[in-house]
Amino acid sequence: MVYPKKVYFKDYVFMVDEHVYEPAEDSFLLAEKMTVTEDEAVLDMGTGCGIIAVLAAEKAKSVVAVDINPYAIECAIKNAEMNGAREKIEFRHGDLVKPIKPNEHFNLILFNAPYLPSEPDEEKSWVGKAWAGGSNGRKVIDRFVMDAPNFLAVGGRIQLVQSSLSDVNRTIQMFNERNLRAMVATQVKVAFERIVLVEVKR
């Protein structure tokens, strides 16, 4: 695999394949604000190049990193090895929670979701799948909100990144309807949207 790009974050270097989402403002927002503590089991959904999984592994007891993109899994494994985090991270290829075992529970679930409204053609490439959220930007978010709480430990947290273009209030409402407490933790203004970090507690 050829890695045409390098991304730097703090003391880490991440190689990014052409078929893998390149970390941007949304990735860095989650990287800076994620609340990993020692002895926690972490699920990194949509791991991409592995930046969040590697950073979470600094403190976490264990990390499970999932992506539907096989190129992303290969790239993330390489980055975990390069950054000395491979032993703590288990990588799984699959669609959202499908690779998660029914009896698995996590203290922290992290997801930089595909959140931008998109046309069907934009979802066909592997990179497109990382950002394209369907006609209203919620195609993947809605599935995640419905399924992820099933794997959240008692007292656990979810940190979800999405856009102001994909109905943040709907996300909060859906989590609250599942007897969770959701709120906007922070947001960053970029060109034509706000990137929003939603925090959820059980």
Positions of predicted regions on the chain:
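Active-site-adjacent beta-strand anchor residues
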Residues: 66, 134, 161
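C-terminal lobe and adjacent flexible extensions of AdoMet/dcAdoMet transferase-like proteins
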Residues: 198-202
